[in-house]
Amino acid sequence: MAQETNQTPGPMLCSTGCGFYGNPRTNGMCSVCYKEHLQRQQNSGRMSPMGTASGSNSPTSDSASVQRADAGLNNCEGAAGSTSEKSRNVPVAALPVTQQMTEMSISREDKITTPKTEVSEPVVTQPSPSVSQPSSSQSEEKAPELPKPKKNRCFMCRKKVGLTGFDCRCGNLFCGLHRYSDKHNCPYDYKAEAAAKIRKENPVVVAEKIQRI
């Protein structure tokens, strides 16, 4: 008999049918289902007093809110009417300076934009003769100068020498007989040229003076 009484009962499933094992302490439900059950009870307990309170106070609160809204609208309409009448009765001198300035600037802009736009006729400019003159002078300057004919006659006897002529330092062309300076009385000064050349090639050497102590 003692053995039969000590035997523990077998595991029982959750009463909600979730498939987990239940516990007799949690009304035969598992821990998860029991927590959900408690949360539902708490939520239902909170909602019920709020619903009753709102149901009892709804008619009076609605009527009071409607009356307040009507009074607010009446006050707004009265204030708007008074402000409009005041604005109509305010003289021009009482307006702020900034508003007067803006009105003056707008009127000036209207006056500037209103004048009729005159159609401007196209102006045709004709080239003046003074402009063409420099171009003609420039063209004349750019024209190549004609080469001077080369001298091919002797300056003394006027004999044709061709390529066998001799140029003198005086700038003339002579034949074989008159190429010497004494034959054609050459005006070029050979002595002065030679003296200048000698001075250039042989500068004067002067010793430095001895400074006495």
UniProtKB/Swiss-Prot annotation:
Mark the residues carrying the PTM N6-acetyllysine. Answer: K209
**Residues the entry annotates as binding Zn(2+) 1:** C14, C18, C30, C33
Q: Where does Zn(2+) 2 bind?
A: C154, C157, C175, H178
Q: Where is the composition biased (Low complexity)?
A: 120-138
A single GO cellular-component term from the record reads: cytoplasm
Coiled-coil ranges from the UniProt annotation: none
Q: Which residues bind Zn(2+) 3?
A: C168, C170, H184, C186
SMART domains associated with the record: ZnF_A20 (SM00259), ZnF_AN1 (SM00154)
Please state what is observed when this gene is inactivated. Resistance to muscle atrophy accompanied by abnormal accumulation of polyubiquitinated proteins in skeletal muscle.
Q: Which organism is it from?
A: Mus musculus (Mouse)
Q: Which GO terms describe its molecular function?
A: DNA binding; zinc ion binding
Question: What biological function has been recorded for the protein in this entry?
Answer: Involved in protein degradation via the ubiquitin-proteasome system. May act by anchoring ubiquitinated proteins to the proteasome. Plays a role in ubiquitin-mediated protein degradation during muscle atrophy. Plays a role in the regulation of NF-kappa-B activation and apoptosis. Inhibits NF-kappa-B activation triggered by overexpression of RIPK1 and TRAF6 but not of RELA. Also inhibits tumor necrosis factor (TNF), IL-1 and TLR4-induced NF-kappa-B activation in a dose-dependent manner. Overexpression sensitizes cells to TNF-induced apoptosis.
Asked whether the keyword Zinc is assigned, the reply is yes
Record keyword Acetylation present = yes
Question: Tissue specificity, please?
Answer: Expressed in brain, muscle, eye, and heart, lower expression in lung, kidney, and spleen, and very low expression in liver. Expressed in myoblast C2C12 cells (at protein level).
Q: Give the protein name, as stated in the record.
A: AN1-type zinc finger protein 5
Residues bearing Phosphoserine are S48, S58
Q: Its principal location?
A: cytoplasm
The segments labelled Disordered in the record are 39-149
Assembly description: Homooligomer and/or heterooligomer. Interacts (via A20-type domain) with IKBKG and RIPK1 and with TRAF6 (via AN1-type domain). Interacts with ubiquitin and polyubiquitinated proteins. Identified in a heterotrimeric complex with ubiquitin and SQSTM1, where ZFAND5 and SQSTM1 both interact with the same ubiquitin molecule.
Q: Which Pfam families match?
A: zf-A20, zf-AN1
* ZnF endpoints (AN1-type): 148-194
Q: Kindly list the ranges of residues that form A20-type zinc fingers according to the record.
A: 8-42
